[in-house]
UniProtKB/Swiss-Prot annotation:
Disruption phenotype: Cells lack 2,5-dihydroxypyridine 5,6-dioxygenase activity. Catalyzes the dioxygenolytic ring cleavage of 2,5-dihydroxypyridine between carbons 5 and 6 generating N-formylmaleamate in the aerobic nicotinate degradation pathway. It comes from Pseudomonas putida (strain ATCC 47054 / DSM 6125 / CFBP 8728 / NCIMB 11950 / KT2440). This is 2,5-dihydroxypyridine 5,6-dioxygenase. It catalyses: 2,5-dihydroxypyridine + O2 = N-formylmaleamate + H(+). InterPro entries: M29_Exopeptidase (IPR052170). Keywords: Aromatic hydrocarbons catabolism, Iron, Metal-binding, Oxidoreductase. Its EC number is 1.13.11.9. Pathway: Cofactor degradation; nicotinate degradation. Disulfide bonds: none annotated. Coiled coil: none annotated. Its cofactor is Fe(2+). Fe cation binds at H265, H318, D320.
């Protein structure tokens, strides 16, 4: 249902407070012509209500010739900030950047974060922002799960659909998303509520089966037939099935880069207010579909780049694929069974 401008501003005030914005802070709102003007205005007004020093940085849109579609998660690499050092410095000068245009997976974002500036991404429709308004309890549950993930040295996924996937861990850090940026150098995304890490380089092995009803992003469609992925030494080596498997093969082949087949981040969803069904109620250009990435008990894996944590794969093609009804084990300890979070107890929704 529609969210009023007043409610949207109140929501931003809540999230900015969680992000430790007050009269001592400066807030930059990063925008472009395609940013939701209501989101931009609400962020500006909320920051002013909190007596922060607020300013806007507006950049022109950027489209790479190889990018397909309007979903900005589909292409990784250059952004409107690439080569624009003056704009980058203006963002680095802020304590918090509210990103309404999306710098994700860009080297400039990593450089900004290294200065201690915090970044909060907010690009979903207001109705989605309202339903998944972050809470301190979201953070508590995600951090409880992070404790286990940081200690784990292996992740194993199984499902009745046929998935049987193993990934050695430890080379890369665990990353949390709980919806607000409250620590120096932290990037987060409102809405969210999940965690992930990356397999050790060239090590993931096994089979992942996309069952009927599972989701491929950025295609933003529900699978209507099974797709089987064979994985060897960290890379997808086979994509089997019917038309949808053929479509996926053709899409990835288009980028003409063997790195697109690498398994990237892997983790699970912890957000009970995110809904697997929500994507079917939105147009494809409505947003990023964070419901799919965050819904409670999913197994979320991605393909493509891992440079954001110091990996060696820099490639433009990025897929996020959340699976339902999986069993997930860390060092043989179950954390998700049949799509339901079972451990740690502190991470479960009540």
């Amino acid at each position: 249902m529609p969210v009023s401008n007043a409610q949207l501003t109140q929501m931003f005030e809540h999230v900015l407070k969680l992000s430790r914005v007050d009269e001592t802070q400066s807030v930059a709102v990063l925008k472009s012509h395609y940013s939701d003007p209501r989101t931009v205005n609400a962020a500006m007004e909320a920051a002013q209500r909190l007596k922060a020093k607020v300013y806007a940085v507006e950049l022109p849109a950027f489209n790479h010739p190889t990018a397909m579609g309007n979903d900005m998660t589909a292409y990784c690499g250059d952004t409107a900030l690439t080569g624009n050092l003056a704009a980058q410095r203006a963002l680095e000068a802020a304590d918090l950047v509210v990103d309404t245009m999306m710098l994700l997976h860009s080297p400039e974002q990593e450089q900004i974060l290294k200065t201690g500036t915090r970044i909060l991404l907010a690009v979903e429709p207001p109705e989605v922002l309202a339903r998944m308004l972050p809470t301190e309890d979201d953070k508590r549950r995600v951090l409880a799960a992070e404790t286990l993930l940081k200690q784990a040295r292996s992740l194993h996924v199984r499902s009745k659909a046929g998935s049987d996937f193993h990934a050695p861990l430890g080379q890369y850090p665990a990353v949390t998303e709980y919806g607000y940026a409250d620590e120096p150098g932290r990037w987060d995304h409102w809405p969210s509520g999940f965690l992930f890490t990356w397999p050790n380089e060239d090590s993931a092995e096994g089979t992942l089966v996309l069952d009927v009803g599972d989701i491929i992003l950025p295609f933003k469609n529900y699978c209507r037939e099974r797709i089987t992925l064979e994985i060897e030494k960290g890379f997808i080596t086979g994509i089997h099935g019917g038309f949808e498997a053929e479509y996926l093969r053709d899409y990835m082949k288009y980028f003409n880069d063997p790195e697109v087949y690498g398994i990237s981040h892997i983790g699970w969803g912890l957000q009970p207010r995110a809904q697997w069904t929500a994507m079917g109620l939105h147009d494809r250009n409505d947003g990023m579909c964070m419901d799919a990435r965050a819904f409670y008990g999913n197994f979320l894996f991605s393909t493509g780049p891992n440079t954001e944590v110091g990996g060696k794969r820099k490639t433009p093609c990025h897929l996020d694929i959340p699976l339902r009804n999986c069993d997930i084990y860390l060092d043989d300890k179950a954390v998700v069974l049949a799509g339901d979070v079972v451990a740690p107890e502190e991470s479960r929704a009540r």
